[in-house]
Amino acid sequence: MTKRRVGIVFGGKSGEHEVSLKSARAVMNALDPEKYTVIPIGITRNGQWLSGGDPLLALEQQADQKMLGRTPQAGVVSETAIVQSAGSLPEQTNVAALDVIIPVLHGPFGEDGTIQGVFEFANLPYVGCGVLAASVGMDKGLMKSAFAAAGLPQVPWQLVLRRDWQTQPEAVYERLEATLHYPMFVKPANLGSSVGISKVSNRAELATGMAEAAGYDRRIVVEQGINAREIEVAILGNDDPKPSVPGEVLPANDFYDYADKYLEGQTQFAIPAELDAATSEQLREMAVTAFKAIDGAGLARVDFFVERETGAIYINEINTFPGFTAMSQYPKLWEATGLGYSELLDRLIDLAIERYHERGR
């Protein structure tokens, strides 16, 4: 059997750089060496593309690029590195020879349609959502608008531009307090993994949370906090997506933050979640609706709130390339549904190639 050549792209310029490295390590360890030849391709924080040697180890150790045994071209960016591969990547990693790419990238420049557009331009099969779905799924404001159009219920929320907050902070605070009540969650519109998110209970905390979020993005989403269970559903597929069993996040702190997700926090998970059959099925159906609402492909994780007092379900967000570490919910949800980690990767690669041929029709 001819092995498929799989390019694993990781790192990147976003605030989720370290998360990407953890996910990439797990993916590379899980790919069956009898089926695949793995070609690691790293992206530094300043956008340089690295290959040859061990770029993942180099980025993990924050080592000098000389560790790779070569000096990458200064300022190499997406289009140059991918399309003109001979000029920026060693011959043995010519991306034109790859059968498929897994962009194990989270956040801006990786999960937001940017790199997906590069792969489309270069006519390369890749795992995951296309340009449109990735873009909408990354921006919480656009995502929420798509969910509203699909009829999915959400908690009240407001979008704030960083410039408005910087020039008229008191007016912004008054608008938020008039439309929402404390506690609120303040989030950068274009980051995931709970990076830059704050739970705020008064105006002083709101000001601090706005400053934190504004450090990451020019668009800030502020949501109404509710007393709710956090439920997640994994999605797998293209035009006929399938949902996993629901799982519940049991955070040790006020909310499921970055430290709990990736730094061996105290958060626990219940998979499958303890839900009645009707609620479980409704969550799974809503997850599929959300995936289709953004024209998703390959994979996603859809997060929900289930209000404790009423049982009402609200969609929170969709993650178009969720974390893939050993601690991550997405592979755990599929394992509980009957699909192991390595088999999940096999299926994602098949879906990427199927979608590539579908686009070529």
Swiss-Prot record:
UniProt name for this protein: D-alanine--D-alanine ligase
Record's subcellular location: Cytoplasm
GO cellular component, one term: cytosol
Family the UniProt entry places it in: Belongs to the D-alanine--D-alanine ligase family.
InterPro entries named among the record's database cross-references: ATP-grasp (IPR011761), ATP_grasp_subdomain_1 (IPR013815), D-Ala_lig_Van_CS (IPR000291), D_ala_D_ala (IPR005905), Dala_Dala_lig_C (IPR011095), Dala_Dala_lig_N (IPR011127), PreATP-grasp_dom_sf (IPR016185)
Source organism, top-level taxon: Bacteria
Residue intervals of the ATP-grasp domain: 144-350
Enzyme class: ligase
Origin organism lineage: Bacteria, Bacillati, Chloroflexota, Chloroflexia, Herpetosiphonales
UniProt GO MF annotations: ATP binding; D-alanine-D-alanine ligase activity; metal ion binding
